[in-house]
Amino acid sequence: MLKKISNGCVHIVQRYLPDPFIFCIILTIVVFIAAIPAAGATPLQVVGFWGTSIWSLLAFSMQMALVLVLGTAMATAPPVKRLLDKIAGVAKTPFSAIVLVTVVGTVASWLNWGFGLVVGALLAKSIAKKVKGVDYRLLIASAYSGFVVWHAGLSGSIPLTITEVTEAVTAATGGALTESIGMDRTVLSPWNLIACLIILILMPLLNAKMHPAANEVVTVDPKLLVEEEVTVRKASTPAEKLEDCKPLSWLVVIIGVVYLVQYFAAAGNPLNALNLNIVNLIFLVLGVLLNGTPLNYVKAVNDAVKGAGGIVLQFPFYAGIMGIMTGAVTEGGPSLAGVISNFFVAISNDITFPLFTFLSAGIVNFFVPSGGGQWAVQAPIVLPATIKMGLDPAVSCMAISWGDAWTNLLQPFWALPALGIAGLGARDIMGFCVVDLILSGIIVCVTFVVVGLI
């Protein structure tokens, strides 16, 4: 039964889901039309929302491109290849291969979302070389499916933001949040950890059960996954000797390590100090170290850059979509995202409020696939309503966080780094991800219903 459902989803997605760039354009058209009545804007004003926002994610786009490039350059270094091969060697059958890559991807995403996006896909590639008969599409989908827990993990941007309430945080929540909320009430709360644990147990089993029959498996030739061996040349000129000079790489590593030690020492709690820039710096330092010589690292980066085209092209369009979603004719006026959030707030009561906050966040995330954007859109609506109803703001913040992560399983935006590493397209994995979306959605919905009853 499960295989019939998953096969049906895969068939539908492969038939009807276009290239992610076309998907961007279609989403832009949909939100453009919807924003006119929702925000009370003219078409020219909506064009203005789009145009003033299209370049608003340039820094973030570069960060995401670096997650892919630096993570790949590090993970393709000879020592890391050997480590991944050893881990991949644990899997002997397609079932164990899918379970292993899902567990690793989920745990890695909970620890840090940038790390999780990269390590799961790279492990999946290593497993594909070793395990015969495993479906490559499902391997990559399984690696990505663990990303659903990222915003309920240690690098979740919303839980980290509210650990220190600044004037900006108070303003972003419409004046509702005036006291800090520790991680013990959000990410490390018992109910959140239980939800993550249930997903960690059930998601690998679900993914493994979705594995197609032998006659329907889509495999990849292991030869296509083998990178060219690095040839050791004999440097004959001063320039070549500099390019192969390991001490130059060591100097970069020393500087980077010293800074990281200072940074984490000053931060107090290392886990709370992790952010995208620090993750990228760690990838950079490790990549330079593990590739040996400066020129080897340059070659590794050049190879990795080839997979970053989708990020470079599509992220500006999602920034434009976010601009349309959040755009208002007057300051504090209605916006399309606000209308969606307000609707769910209006139909909620004390018990269903966390559930409907989660569902509304999932819908908004489909058009605003950014934790920061999600917070900017929903916090001014959800948090004042939370305080007015006498509910726990920590639960509301986590409901937004879970919704933000949940529909990433159906949103190609965040899958781009993993797809770039794997050499696949969105339609190759999204059919499987639809089933994962349903399972994780049920788990989280039940969680918030229970939390609402407590």
Give the ranges of each region predicted by the language model:
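Hydrophobic alpha-helical transmembrane segments of multi-pass integral membrane proteins
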Residues: 90-123, 315-329, 338-384, 388-389
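Membrane-interfacial loop-to-helix junctions in multi-pass transporters
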Residues: 19, 54-61, 88-100, 131-139, ...
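Flexible loop linkers connecting adjacent transmembrane helices
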Residues: 5-9, 42-50, 75-91, 124-136, ...
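Transmembrane alpha-helical segments of multi-pass membrane transport proteins and ion-pumping complexes
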Residues: 36, 60, 64, 72-77, ...
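Alpha-helical transmembrane segments and their immediate interhelical/interface regions
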Residues: 94-130, 266-291
